[in-house]
């Protein structure tokens, strides 16, 4: 289009972040990390983390400024299927394939719970073998994935926003556990995802639980959970996130921060799409169950959690062999779903 430019948008880590990474390695780490009091080291790491987020915000803002002036040529994802306009679809992805016996136990639990609570929604489980039936990605996306410059986690960002833009429905990570049917109110919204609630009371509890993801510090720009997203077809926030991730991966071979997409979302809804932002429901809610996953099972505690939310973000990355499993919430769900 007229006025569009071919320009590279490179992301760079902050100077403080680069220095910090150097100091954490030999030979400096013996002085920097080992001899420094833990509280001081942790405080420095938080400030470095915020500094790097600030640098990422600056890089995203450069792209956003050109994007909203229609100055960027963007590669397209091509949809391959057609669905009925009123068809409600649940999308899931597991790159290694859905052979049940090969799934991690946590994913097996979520798999069976999804089958139980899918209701009358069309459930489409994707893997690397069948995504081509639904979407055609730009060559550079698949090339960077095959060369392992892009990991599955960040390829999944492109996949989820492509599916939601072109088909709509609800994206649900393979590690999302349902304990009831999906709330119908979320399907009625133009889009919905869980976000950071500034009025949440037990902030310290969650910052101690996961200091990388959870923070209510004003410097933090990571404020959304992408593991479950409801969206109507052609939602402009989903479309914009997809466009800008395609620009990022066109010009970059590595991520500046694991949550760089979440930082982009914050910039979009706080600066460009304020009126279009979905209502804020605390992203602590889907984490409540996994926070106690390896604790002693309590029927009362489970009821309290599931009364407040039916959508739970789990993880298969924690080595359960190193955790107490007997009589835990984990064991309860394993037994419930006969795993």
Regions found by a protein language model. Give the residues of each.
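Glycosyltransferase-associated regions of secretory-pathway enzymes
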Residues: 2-156, 174-339
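Small-residue hinge/turn detector
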Residues: 157-167
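Active-site acidic Asp-centered loop
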Residues: 167, 172-173
